[in-house]
Swiss-Prot record:
One GO CC term on file: ribosome
Subunit composition and interactions: Part of the 50S ribosomal subunit.
InterPro entries: Rib_uL2_dom2 (IPR014722), Ribosomal_uL24 (IPR003256), Ribosomal_uL24_KOW (IPR041988), Translation_prot_SH3-like_sf (IPR008991)
Function, as annotated: One of two assembly initiator proteins, it binds directly to the 5'-end of the 23S rRNA, where it nucleates assembly of the 50S subunit.
Assigned protein family: Belongs to the universal ribosomal protein uL24 family.
Keyword Lipid biosynthesis belongs to the record: no
Keyword terms, alphabetized: Ribonucleoprotein, Ribosomal protein, RNA-binding, rRNA-binding
GO BP: translation
Cysteines paired by S-S bonds: none
Protein name (database record): Large ribosomal subunit protein uL24
Length: 82
């Protein structure tokens, strides 16, 4: 089960094989926001408090496209014996 704070790897899409940490989860839609993955550009209007422009931020990705990475299980590569 994918939870906030865990490391995951992307299985499909333009960010395939990239790894990152889960920032946010959207349970009703089965989507997760991963740090540094699925970056999109948003156009922001100028307001009294904030300056407008183009802002890059992470977008949600479906959890079926993510694979949980187990840091404890990572070991050295093993050789097959003949």
């Amino acid at each position: 089960m994918i939870k906030k704070g865990l490391k995951v790897r992307v299985l499909t899409g333009r960010d395939k094989k990239k790894e990152g940490e889960v920032i946010e989860i959207d349970r009703p839609n089965n989507r997760a926001k991963v740090q540094g993955i699925n970056i999109v550009k948003k156009h922001v209007k100028t307001t009294k408090e904030k300056k407008g422009g183009i802002v890059s931020k992470e977008s949600f990705i479906h959890i079926s496209n993510l694979k949980l990475i187990d840091e404890k299980a990572k070991t050295k590569k093993t050789e097959a014996k003949k």
